[in-house]
């Protein structure tokens, strides 16, 4: 069994990579991470993106946090993260709303006000 990769998110939050799958077809690395944050809240997506980008020596805009799940009161979270090799693959495969969440951008939806303007 290979060595587990440790991720330090902050002073109170650390994690380990439980599964690391190299997906060559999608040109990405799929990570399943177990986060320990006992005594503090669930880490934010931005904190996770920064920590994962620094751990795997990649740009922050190539990291997409798919999901973060925490059981009530446990202090342990599970995160599902994709780390892409290039921006083109990320744009083709990930939904725009997820890309916007991780970068902090607001993506306008084409609601009723957008239809009235046309």
From Swiss-Prot:
Gene name, Swiss-Prot/TrEMBL: rps24e
Gene Ontology molecular function: structural constituent of ribosome
Family: Belongs to the eukaryotic ribosomal protein eS24 family.
Lineage of the species this protein comes from: Archaea, Thermoproteota, Thermoprotei, Sulfolobales, Sulfolobaceae
Annotated keywords: Ribonucleoprotein, Ribosomal protein
Transmembrane segments annotated in the record for this chain: none
UniProt key word S-adenosyl-L-methionine: no
Pfam annotation, one family: Ribosomal_S24e
The keyword Ribosomal protein appears for this protein: yes
Protein name, per record: Small ribosomal subunit protein eS24
Top-rank taxon, per record: Archaea
Coiled coil (UniProt feature): none
GO CC list: ribonucleoprotein complex; ribosome
A GO BP entry: translation
InterPro entries in UniProt: eRP_eS24_sf (IPR053709), Ribosomal_eS24 (IPR001976), Ribosomal_eS24_CS (IPR018098), Ribosomal_uL23/eL15/eS24_sf (IPR012678)
